[in-house]
UniProtKB/Swiss-Prot annotation:
UniProt superkingdom: Bacteria
Name of the molecule in the record: tRNA (guanine-N(7)-)-methyltransferase
GO molecular function: tRNA (guanine(46)-N7)-methyltransferase activity
Binding site for substrate: K147, D179, T216, K217, F218, E219
Active-site positions on this chain: D143
Organism: Shewanella frigidimarina (strain NCIMB 400)
Lineage: Bacteria, Pseudomonadati, Pseudomonadota, Gammaproteobacteria, Alteromonadales
Disulfide-linked positions: none
Amino acid sequence: MSDVTTAEFNEDGKYIRKIRSFVLREGRLTKGQSQAIEAHWPAMGLDYTPQALELTQVFGRDADTVLEIGFGMGASLVQMAKAAPEQNFIGIEVHKPGIGTCLSEAGAAEVTNLRVYHHDAMEVLEHSIVDGSLERVQLFFPDPWHKKRHHKRRIVQAEFVQLIRRKLKIGGVFHMATDWENYSEHMLEIMNAAEGYKNQSTTGTVVERPEHRPLTKFEARGHRLGHGVWDIMFERTA
């Protein structure tokens, strides 16, 4: 049994810490995922501690660092790390099968600039990531909680984006993507009201998908069916 902290917010966007316990059963993992964790966790896994992470020690170099919150199965994160060997990448994911698949693909791709946490992103950000240390924070396709009464559960809230701002360097970018138009509107509303940020869109709305974000199979299928995807990028200015 593992205690994992999950994010929840009240109607004013105030972060509420709640502890939810659930069983992380090995039986949920495929044989390949289990083998990948056993083989690659020693080199690529980061065990959560409430102490500040020394990035130069973790990666053995001083380089721009990109952090992704909730990388799912990790395919696009591995692609990004492979395509930008000059950068460091950190992924955070709470679901163990995603960790296993990501490590499997990272091992096959022979990437050396990727590290992953199996922990809640809020705790990692609050306690392990040094303020002003990140070049980019990525939040791709978070749960939209599409029912209005559930909007308070959306991770993008006023307090959350200020936590992200603290962790970004001046000039660093918070990059969000969603395939739910209402959530993109919510993201823009929160970000436009947030101090210390500037929208990178010349129109003050969304941006075209940047080259650094790979086109996923799910997204490509959505495009063929006429479904939209909205990318939002805000730069830390203060």
